[in-house]
A protein has these predicted regions:
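Basic, flexible linker segments flanking DNA-binding modules
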Residues: 1-41
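Long, charged, low-complexity intrinsically disordered regions
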Residues: 30-33, 44, 48, 52-53, ...
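Glycine-centered loop/turn motifs
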Residues: 42-46, 167-168
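Short conserved beta-strand segments at catalytic cores or DNA/RNA-binding microdomains
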Residues: 40, 53-54, 59-76, 80
Length: 179
């Protein structure tokens, strides 16, 4: 009977197969050490860092996808319904449709991310929604637990936290609010 249980056991939520694949360690994709040296100097525009900012922890909450340009510190923030690789690639597809395929390739030459499950599907991040064989960008993975390798992005995330502190729900936010 339900009233006789001690209440300390909760049923774990099942992880879908396609999401489980991205929980495995990243053995594919390019690391930050494969990135061209000129990206480190910040002399050229078009090299971005990408991360997710979460709202209420443990809730089915929207997330903020934050893209930060390394030289100009320009930022693009997209509201995502969840923390999946599919929603990240859909957000990049939306941006690509908005600015055009050629402009996207010029604007987003490289994107550096952490090793989160949401960025593991590097093929969908690099590949255009048009199905073109030419990659729309190149993705590089930072080393695990090395947030300083994406310092621009981490600083912008800190600024976002001034307005949306940890523990704040993003449920009431709209895309227009975050732009």
């Amino acid at each position: 009977r339900k009233d006789l249980t001690c209440g300390k056991y909760k049923k774990k939520e099942k992880i879908k197969k396609e999401e489980r694949e991205f929980l495995k360690p990243n053995k594919e994709g390019k690391t930050i050490h494969d990135r061209p040296e000129e990206i480190k100097t910040r002399e050229e525009i078009g090299h971005w860092e990408m991360d997710l900012v979460e709202g209420l922890k443990g809730q089915k909450e929207p997330y903020l996808l934050v893209l930060s340009e390394r030289k100009t510190r320009k930022e693009i923030i997209e509201l995502l319904p969840n923390k999946t690789a599919k929603s990240v690639s859909k957000a990049l597809d939306r941006i690509e449709k908005e600015i055009g395929v050629v402009k996207f390739r010029e604007t987003f030459k490289t994107i550096t991310t952490d090793n989160g499950a949401e960025f593991r599907n590097w093929k969908s991040i690099e590949q255009s929604y048009t199905g073109s064989k030419k990659a729309r960008t190149s993705q590089y993975f930072a080393d695990a637990y090395s947030s300083w390798q994406r310092g621009t992005n981490e600083n912008i995330n800190k600024m976002i936290r001034r307005f949306l502190p940890k523990g704040t729900s993003f449920k009431g936010l709209k895309q227009e609010d975050v732009k």
